[in-house]
Each structure stands twice: as structure tokens, then as C-alpha cells.
Amino acid sequence: MIDRYKHQQLRIGLVSPQQISAWATKKIPNGEIVGEVTKPYTFHYKTNKPEKDGLFCERIFGPIKSGICACGNYRVIGDEKGDPKFCEQCGVEFVDSRIRRYQMGYIKLTCPVTHVWYLKRLPSYIANLLDKPLKELEGLVYCDVCFDRNPNFSFARPITKKPTFLRLRGSFEYEIQSWKYSIPLFFTTQGFEIFRNREISTGAGAIREQLADLDLRIIIENSLVEWKQLGEEGPTGNEWEDRKIVRRKDFLVRRMELAKHFIRTNIEPEWMVLCLLPVLPPELRPIIQIEGGKLMSSDINELYRRVIYRNNTLTDLLTTSRSTPGELVMCQEKLVQEAVDTLLDNGIRGQPMRDGHNKVYKSFSDVIEGKEGRFRETLLGKRVDYSGRSVIVVGPSLSLHRCGLPREIAIELFQTFVIRGLIRQHLASNIGVAKSQIREKKPIVWEILQEVMQGHPVLLNRAPTLHRLGIQSFQPILVEGRTICLHPLVCKGFNADFDGDQMAVHVPLSLEAQAEARLLMFSHMNLLSPAIGDPISVPTQDMLIGLYVLTSGTRRGICANRYNPCNRKNYQNERIYETNYKYMKEPFFCNSYDAIGAYRQKRINLDSPLWLRWQLDQRVIASKEVPIEVHYESFGNYHEIYAHYLIVRSVKKETLYIYIRTTVGHISLYREIEEAIQGFSQACSYDT
């Protein structure tokens, strides 16, 4: 188990066999050391209990039920009495069953096995360190070298620290005709294993010996010297040779970086060859009973069984059968290597292994990699509880710190809080009754949901979260539909728009998370870019288009509209198709409320010109501007008509009224700006 307070990061790397043994072995109170899995069995078909020393053994991995051993005896966990802490009959400790989630086991391999990730994955780290072709190493690991009758194919290189057969210093071939008949005799004697390990050391054992003999610092020095020599030679004039030199220099750089990484992390190269194979905790590879009494098992269990079967067969060949032919032993070693390869990465050597239904087994690599792997699904980008996801749409009537949640999402996110509210108000006797009321969507449910949401912020996140403004908190309100409503000014921080983007909703549960959401993450508290300090809540995209449409009324003045032949034709068309209002007569309004009311009643359009009474104390006339027309009334009052405004004067030339020529769109924008300025002024007055 990982303690989140002690461990702030996770690193995957190579470990030594001693470390694997320390993780997987444990000493039970009677002094016995357990941890090795030796049998390929899971559960007994009659008793339905885990087999001893099998893949689900309770002695190795802990009890299935807390405080109950394999015999059925029960002990209180943590009891300080003198009772033994384990069962003397079955050897199972009386501990919590959650130990089966992290207690590992191990398989002691009869022959060394290379880790397929470091051999077959590109680039091959083993081939890089040994400076040998990958094909040659594969032939050595999978025992294809010793039995290929091709005269041009060579044996593996002998280990230099051992006395070798006929003092071999390099690869040797079937150069002498008599060797074809004399050498195979050595592989049929009883001392085959001793001869092989002493003389030619094939298989993964040869790789392990060569990796153990490496001096990483010498590799770095020699690679650097060779790299400098290749750089000093310069171009040869032959394009093919120049490409080979460039590839060689790149290889030397990668080799030096790899050797430095091994030195920096205190990892020995021979750890890339496995002698002990870790066995995952049983709760991470479960066997589940489904309807009808059938069992459903993880694919990893079957792959582990195959490894144990082949490993036990190899052990029997080397121990019980003294006269086993060498070819059979090496073939069995190859089967063990392939079984471990399939367990770690199925299909990396060609066709993947399939079950009886022609379904590919999911190996350890398939479990942890990809979008549905352990890391991305359950650790990094996992779908957590109390979260939802939906498409975002614009909410023009929302405040900057609010967001609209659909009822369907809100009732799921806050269901536990609603259940608690129903029970506290004695509207439901238990959880079951409360859930039934929620399913029936009774009116009281929505009332309690509204109360809960008023005091609980939510977090909105849009992937990819590239900076801290990619996740912000909002005060949720209920909306109809199935989409999340969002204020358009916060889109720039999320790098979002309303063309189908989706956002995730999270509910902060702990008090610390709620405090952080309220004090630091609210959208109206993040108005500046954390990178450069510029305002980030500025109109973009849809808002700019909306402002343009809102203020797109004609600005050419009354002269252009009245005396332009094109406009006269347009006015005639509008007068024909519009019966509610004659466009040739522009209406007069006393205030902005009357103008907006006429627009809502569809008496005028958004861009229709109109006359709005203006305040007398605000100057609108330029000093050198003269009226275009002057209309006189019978009582002596007269109207001075300018391009964008109109003044009503009395007989004594006193200004009675001032009208400005505008549109409903301009009026709406002006009112919004006026309200914003008034709110800012009030906020400043409160601060002072």
C-alpha cells in the first residue's frame, strides 16, 4: 500500500532479486518463511478454498476473510491476549483480509529469463549495452543458436572469465566436418548442464553473465573516444558510409546516456535478467463467481499458471531425470522464456497467445498501458466518484461565478447530500425510501437539491489542463436540458468554445477542497493570466460577434437613410412586408425601458432606428454643427433635426427635449456598461 503522506511520486524501474525476495517473503510466527508459489493451482474444485502454495494461497497472501484462517477458526484482529496470531494447523495468520491487495509472492525460476521489455522493445537496452545485434541476442536467448544446422550460423560467444571449450575466444562455426558429429555428443551426456554452463553458457544465463561483466564507466569512456574519432574523420565522400557513421555516432550517444542512467539510479545491468518472478497480489487478479455458479478469472492467472507449469517441468528434467537429452532441456528453457514473455507482454514476439475462444490474453503490459490501463484509467486520468461530463453551451444570463448544471447531472452528483437532507427533515425514514423518492423525482427533492447546491461549489475542468485556469470553481444552479451552461467570459481560461467542447464536473468533498475552491479557484477571482498578468476574462469569439450584431445598426445618419434611393427602396419593401410598424416614421421613446419593451413586443427590430429622449445636462451637439432640417409646430415650438440627434426648442429658444437617434442594440449595450460601472463604484465605496 502507498501512503499518500509519505510518497509523493511513483517511479517504475528495475529491482534486484534481493529486493523482490524482500517484498514477496514473510516470516510467520512459527519461524517459517513463506512467499514462493510452487503450484499452478488456484481453488480446490470440491472445497472451493485456495490451494496451498498456489496462486491464491492464504499462507502466502493472507486470509480471504479477516480473522478467519483456512481451517475456519476465528480470532479477533489486534487482540492483545496470549492467543497465537496464526493457525498452527494451516499456517494462516489472523490479519485483515486487505493484506491480499498488496502482499506479493514470487516464482523461483529454474533458469534465468530476460525481461522482454528490455530485450524486444525498441530501442533494445540489452543490445545497446552489449553492443550486439538484436537478432544475435534473440537467437542466444531463445536457444535457436545451438540447434541450427546451417553451416554459416555460429554459436554464442563464450564467457571470457571461464575456461572454455578448446580455448574459444569468439564465435565458432562448423568449420570442421567432424565437429558435426562430435559436438552433439556433449549434449546427450549426464553432465550436459555442467558442460553448458562452463563452456558456452547459452540462453538468458549467457546474457546475464555478459551484463554482469560490464563496467559502465569504461563503456562511457570507450564510447566517448570512438565518438570523437568518428567526428574527427569527417565525410568520406561515400553517402552510404557517411550514413553508417552518423548512425553509429547516434548509437554511441544513446549508449552513453543509458550507461549514465544506470550509474545515476544505482541499477545493475544484470537485473534486466530475471531469476525471481514477482507474483501480483491476488486481489489485483481476482477470480469472481458469476450467475450460474461459473467462475470468471483474470487472464494473468492463466499466464502465471503456464509459467509455473513449464518451470516445474524444467525442474523435473534437471533433477529427477539424469539422462535427459540436452536438446529437450534447452527446448524447455525456451518454453519458460516464452511463457514469461507472454505474461509480461503478450504478442511482442509475433502472434499473441489466445484462449479457447480465440480471445487474446491480456498480459501485464496490456493491464497497465493504454487508455484503459491501470495508470490512465484508475490513477492519472481516472473517472472519479462524484463527477460528471457534458457538452458546454453559452449561458448569457449567468453571473461570472455561476454555472448551469442539468438536473440529471446535479441529482447524481449531490445524491448523498439530498438523501441526508431528506432523512434529517424526516421526509424519509431510511436510505432506501430516500432513493425511491429521488427516482420518482418528487418536488421536495428539487427543493432540497437547491438548498444543497447553494452552499456547495463545483469544479469545472476542460482537458487538457495545461495551466491552473484549466480547472476553476463555480456556484451551480439548476438548468433545463442536458448541457452545462457557462459564462462566455471564462472560456479563454479554459481555452474552450461552444462548438461541441465537453467539460467535467467534480464535487469537492473535504473541507480543505471546499475552502480552496471558495478562496482560490472561483472564476471571478482569476481574472488575470498567471503567466503574463494580462486580463484573461475578455470578450472573445461569440461575444465579439454578439457585440457586433448588437451594434450593427446603420451609422450613416438621417440624411443617408432619408435621401438615398437605395434606402428608399428598402423602406418601401419593409413597409410592404411589415404591417405592425411603418418604418418611414421612426418612433420616439421617453426612456430605454419603453424602447426595450417595444422590442420585446416585436414592434421594432434590434437594429431599427429610433429616437430616445436624452438628458438635458449631457452635451451632444458639436459647436460648429448646424441642423439639417427645422420643423415648426403650430404652437411655436420647433424641432432642430441633426444627423444623429433631435432638439425640441420653445418659442423662447429654450431647450425642452433632446432625442438621440439610436437602436435597441445600442441601448442594451449602454445599460450593461452603466450597470457594471455602478457596481464597480459601489464596490469601491464599500472598500473605502
Swiss-Prot record:
Binding of Mg(2+), residues: 497, 499, 501
Q: Which UniProt keywords apply?
A: Chloroplast, DNA-directed RNA polymerase, Magnesium, Metal-binding, Nucleotidyltransferase, Plastid, Transcription, Transferase, Zinc
Q: Where is it localised?
A: Plastid, Chloroplast
Required co-factor(s) are: Mg(2+); Zn(2+)
Q: What is its main location?
A: plastid
Q: Which GO terms describe its biological process?
A: DNA-templated transcription
Q: Which Gene Ontology terms cover its molecular function?
A: DNA binding; DNA-directed RNA polymerase activity; magnesium ion binding; zinc ion binding
Q: What catalytic activity is recorded?
A: RNA(n) + a ribonucleoside 5'-triphosphate = RNA(n+1) + diphosphate
Q: What does the note accompanying the cofactor annotation read?
A: Binds 1 Mg(2+) ion per subunit. Binds 1 Zn(2+) ion per subunit.
Which Gene3D superfamilies does this chain map to? 1.10.40.90, 2.40.40.20, RNA polymerase II, clamp domain, RNA polymerase Rpb1, domain 3
**Which PANTHER family does the protein's record reference?**
DNA-DIRECTED RNA POLYMERASE (PTHR19376), DNA-DIRECTED RNA POLYMERASE SUBUNIT BETA (PTHR19376:SF54)
Subunit structure of this chain's protein: In plastids the minimal PEP RNA polymerase catalytic core is composed of four subunits: alpha, beta, beta', and beta''. When a (nuclear-encoded) sigma factor is associated with the core the holoenzyme is formed, which can initiate transcription.
What name does UniProt use for this protein? Answer: DNA-directed RNA polymerase subunit beta'
